[in-house]
Amino acid sequence: MAQKQKCVAMLLAGGKGSRLSALTKNLAKPAVPFGGKYRIIDFTLSNCANSGIETVGILTQYQPLELHNYIGIGNAWDLDRVSGGVTVLPPYAESSGVKWYTGTASAIYQNLNYLSQYEPDYVLILSGDHIYKMDYSKMLDYHIEKEADVSISVIEVPWDEASRFGIMNTNEEMEIVEFEEKPQFPRSNLASMGIYIFNWAILKEYLEMDARNPESSNDFGKDVLPLLLDEGKKLMAYPFEGYWKDVGTVKSLWEANMDLLRDETSLNLNDRDWRIYSVNPNEPPQYIAEKAKVEESLINEGCVIEGDVKHSVLFQGVTVEEGSMVIDSVVMPGAKIGKNVVIERAIVGSEMVIEDGTIIRPEKNVDDVVLIAEGK
């Protein structure tokens, strides 16, 4: 029996991320590069470390190899513990064969034995594909104070975007009275962030109940939460007011990177009190040539800049040759940009080679974002 834990986190990291197109052709969405030196999953894992959550199960499925290698034993996030720490939980084979995760609830259900060994009081369920900084310990305090069965973190979204999210309708005490999955005509703009705290006994009971239902899609939002409400359980909404971004599309991923370049951004990567940790390769210092120009940009180690870079994010090992211009763009690790190239409002994938004289920018709608990546 493992040492008892007050709270165990379960991080859902098996998503395909098909809306990110070629960026996730051979890569799980949580492993997609972000912010010049990070992966998307770094934010959730760093939140766990900074919040004092010491036991994290990471549930993987789609294209897991690079993600598994990246996570390792969790030492980058100080989660390499003798008791607890990080455990990667892919689908596994039973006597009846391999059982793939069929939904978010299915993924947790198939790992109830992992949770049981810690006898937790609470289980924190997280998504590995959002960009945000959050103190989960404050949410846990709120959950305990409200004597909730389940607490769900919510954020106000613009009304014209509310139909894209799972929406929580609450009373004045922030108790959830109704959950609507992507409603056509929303009555609230409180969107679920996909962050849940369950009392362990409640989670176990309702996941087992859901698994016995042949008509269930085994999803928290579509099946488990509505069932809890129908049976009169106490679900509380926990309001979050910081930066949070669902980077599930090419444009939203680009927007989140551009947010880092604002003079005043609520996503401060220089916050020494809430560091974002990552696994970084050893690279030499960046080199910026005499005639190069760099403005309002994040330039990581190992970059060689001989052209112009303006309001852009460049990951490690990127080369920008003489006469080239990179504007309002994200260039992922190891990309090589030749001479006299123009790149504007684009994401250039890892290890891409852009030939001399190439022009890359939106052709029809100036508000679009161009993706240049393998398989595109």
From Swiss-Prot:
Catalysed reaction equations from the record: alpha-D-glucose 1-phosphate + ATP + H(+) = ADP-alpha-D-glucose + diphosphate
InterPro entries attached to this UniProt entry: ADP-Glc_PPase (IPR011831), ADP_Glu_pyroP_CS (IPR005836), GlgC_bac (IPR023049), GlmU/GlgC-like_hexapep (IPR056818), NTP_transferase_dom (IPR005835), Nucleotide-diphossugar_trans (IPR029044), Trimer_LpxA-like_sf (IPR011004)
Record-linked PROSITE patterns: ADP_GLC_PYROPHOSPH_1, ADP_GLC_PYROPHOSPH_2
Metabolic or biological pathway: Glycan biosynthesis; glycogen biosynthesis
Coiled-coil stretches: none
EC class name: transferase
Gene Ontology molecular-function annotations: ATP binding; glucose-1-phosphate adenylyltransferase activity
Enzyme Commission numbers on file: 2.7.7.27
UniProt KW Repeat keyword: no
Alphabetical UniProt keywords: ATP-binding, Carbohydrate metabolism, Glycogen biosynthesis, Glycogen metabolism, Nucleotide-binding, Nucleotidyltransferase, Transferase
Chain sites annotated for binding alpha-D-glucose 1-phosphate: Y101, G166, E181, K182, S192
GO terms, biological process: glycogen biosynthetic process
Highest rank taxon of the organism: Bacteria
Complexes and interactors: Homotetramer.
Physiological role: Involved in the biosynthesis of ADP-glucose, a building block required for the elongation reactions to produce glycogen. Catalyzes the reaction between ATP and alpha-D-glucose 1-phosphate (G1P) to produce pyrophosphate and ADP-Glc.
Family named by the database record: Belongs to the bacterial/plant glucose-1-phosphate adenylyltransferase family.
Protein name per the record: Glucose-1-phosphate adenylyltransferase
Name of the coding gene: glgC
